[in-house]
């Protein structure tokens, strides 16, 4: 007669849960807890009750509406400029090599490591009221006032952001362009395809994932950019990050500042969701930037 022995239950392995607990604890401490404090402060009205009183107050403000429109306008135009300039420069550096092209590529990489205020400071030295360009033009043509004054406007902010964030488009794009099979380009040229047609039908589809990855990163960063707008001091250019700073630091209105910051977070997440939706519609997989 054979005995049927009960199967031993496998011991519960808690080690994976312990490894997961540490990053969750770090996230909760450094991200979720501060975010919950911002949400609580934003939703707490003047009477101490939780509600949407502050939200209605902020949305009805013309200053907030203007800052929101400025933020979106700067973000979209700066991102479009980054995509256009980054695409042209990447195509030249990858497919039209010339002496010094590798050096230029390395210089572009170093731009990412530079603080944004340093680029803005360089713009001030070159295009400012007392900068090199205005000084040279006033000396040559005897102008009484500086003829170049775009730096302290929205156009100056957009140009500075394009200069700062274009390398974020170029890095993934140049890596994608180098992986394109050169035989496809040669075959298209032999068949008599125009260079613009080669770019549109061969290069662009292969580079689309890198373009969308770099463009989405530029869009998020330009939406939340604070240092460039503050350092340039553009007249009449108020953005959501600038409004958060002025409400919290200059006016000590922390409830309104938290509400604007919360709206800015929702705006950033919404823009990122639009990117993910567009990527899924076009069949593009997310790539690291």
Swiss-Prot record:
The chain crosses the membrane at residues 19-39, 76-96, 111-131, 150-170, 202-222, 254-274. It holds the Pfam family BPD_transp_1. GO terms for biological process: 2-aminoethylphosphonate transport; transmembrane transport. Residues 68-275 form the ABC transmembrane type-1 domain. It is a multi-pass membrane protein. PROSITE patterns: ABC_TM1. One of its GO terms (cellular component) is plasma membrane. The keyword Transmembrane helix applies. Gene3D superfamilies: MetI-like (1.10.3720.10). It is found in: Cell inner membrane. Keywords: Cell inner membrane, Cell membrane, Membrane, Transmembrane, Transmembrane helix, Transport. Probably part of the PhnSTUV complex (TC 3.A.1.11.5) involved in 2-aminoethylphosphonate import. Probably responsible for the translocation of the substrate across the membrane. NCBIfam families: PhnU, PRK15050.1. Belongs to the binding-protein-dependent transport system permease family. This is Putative 2-aminoethylphosphonate transport system permease protein PhnU. It comes from Salmonella paratyphi A (strain ATCC 9150 / SARB42).
């Amino acid at each position: 007669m054979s005995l049927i022995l009960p199967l031993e239950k496998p011991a519960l392995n808690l080690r994976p849960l312990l490894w997961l607990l540490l990053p969750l604890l770090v996230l909760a401490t450094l991200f979720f807890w501060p975010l919950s404090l911002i949400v609580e402060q934003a939703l707490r009205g003047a009477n101490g009750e939780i509600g949407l009183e502050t939200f209605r107050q902020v949305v009805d403000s013309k200053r907030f509406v203007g800052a929101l429109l400025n933020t979106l306008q700067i973000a979209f135009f700066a991102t479009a400029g980054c995509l256009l300039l980054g695409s042209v420069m990447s195509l030249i550096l990858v497919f039209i090599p010339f002496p010094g092209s590798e050096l230029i590529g390395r210089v572009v990489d170093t731009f990412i490591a530079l603080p944004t205020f340093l680029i803005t400071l360089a713009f001030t030295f070159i295009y400012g009221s007392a900068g090199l360009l205005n000084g040279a033009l006033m000396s040559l043509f005897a102008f009484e006032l500086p003829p170049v004054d775009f730096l302290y406007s929205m156009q100056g902010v957009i140009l500075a952001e394009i200069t700062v964030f274009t390398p974020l488009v170029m890095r993934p794009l140049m890596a994608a362009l180098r992986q394109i099979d050169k035989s496809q380009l040669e075959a298209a040229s032999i068949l008599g395809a125009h260079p613009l047609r080669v770019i549109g039908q061969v290069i662009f589809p292969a580079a689309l994932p890198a373009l969308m990855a770099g463009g989405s990163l530029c869009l998020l960063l330009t939406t939340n950019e604070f240092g460039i707008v503050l350092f340039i001091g553009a007249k009449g250019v108020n953005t959501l990050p600038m409004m958060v700073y002025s409400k919290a630091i200059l006016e000590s209105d922390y409830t309104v500042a938290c509400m604007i910051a919360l709206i800015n977070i929702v705006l950033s997440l919404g823009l990122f969701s639009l990117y993910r939706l567009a990527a899924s519609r076009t069949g593009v997989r997310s790539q690291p930037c």
